[in-house]
Amino acid sequence: MVYQCMIKSSSRTLAIALLVSAGLPVLSLAQAETDYEARLIEAKGEVTVFTADEPEGVPGGADMPLLPGDKVKTGEDGSAEIALSGEHGISLRPRSELTLSNLRRADSELSLALGSLLAKVQSLAGGLFRVRTPSAVAAVRGTEFGVEIDEADPEQTLVGVFDEGKVTVSGADGAEETLKSNQETVVRRGSRPMPAYQLRRLARHRSAMRGFRKRAGLMRKEWRAMTPEQRQAKRREMLPKLKLLRQQRLQKAQELREKARDKKPVRAPRADQQKMERRKQAIRDRLRGKGN
């Protein structure tokens, strides 16, 4: 028994040493037990993941392990779904930007810089789950909720609760407003949250939330946890492939631009230009006639 434990310990030490030599961050066992395991479950359309190793970003890939500090950005047609240890789910909507600031179970935090997200958070026993925007902080212990930075007015954040549960919303001065089922609030930068009112502006996300609820349930059922070594190995395997894919896409886009430029049609003279040319020609003809 002791011999088997020694073998396991040696194998784990060797795996960590290989990761360190490759220049990759290593998750300790203690960290793995106290942190959520974040994973990009689905990426549709334009989704880019920015990491410490790839600051220019790589295309988002399904089942890609994510680490604290990673940023996920969606384009005009993009959407992404992120799982935290198979317990909680985040749906990132188009034109959004989310950073996994902190994945500690006791006090996790996501930072939304642009756009909107929907979240399905299971009941937390003593832990706290927060979403921070430039103007507000939404703290939950288990519920279905949405957060949106107003596209027309980025200084304003909307927070709403869809299902049963509570979300505590605070502004810059620390003043709090608690939302219950079917309620929302608005927070302007530097101001306190408005008193809770009936879900209105975020109500348009209700059908999307219902669909995500089903996928989150399936995600929990199919979730297979990975060890820190497996996550690092998976990430090390995926990043070079995704980087190559980004380069191929950039090259293809450049070729398409050049092709479109080469095929740019010669603009035909407008009718008024043609009329002016005829008049000029008539004048030239008359002048030549007088000269003769």
Name each model-derived stretch.
Residues 2-15, 19, 25-35, 56-61, ...:
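C-terminal interaction modules
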Residues 29-73, 79-83:
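N-terminal domain-start segments of secreted/luminal proteins
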Residues 32, 55, 92-96, 139-151:
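Conserved short histidine dyad/triad with adjacent acidic residue
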Residues 52, 77, 85-87, 95, ...:
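Surface loops and adjacent helix of pleckstrin homology
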Residues 66-72, 99-103, 147-151, 184-195:
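Short, surface-exposed linear segments at secondary-structure transitions and domain or protein termini
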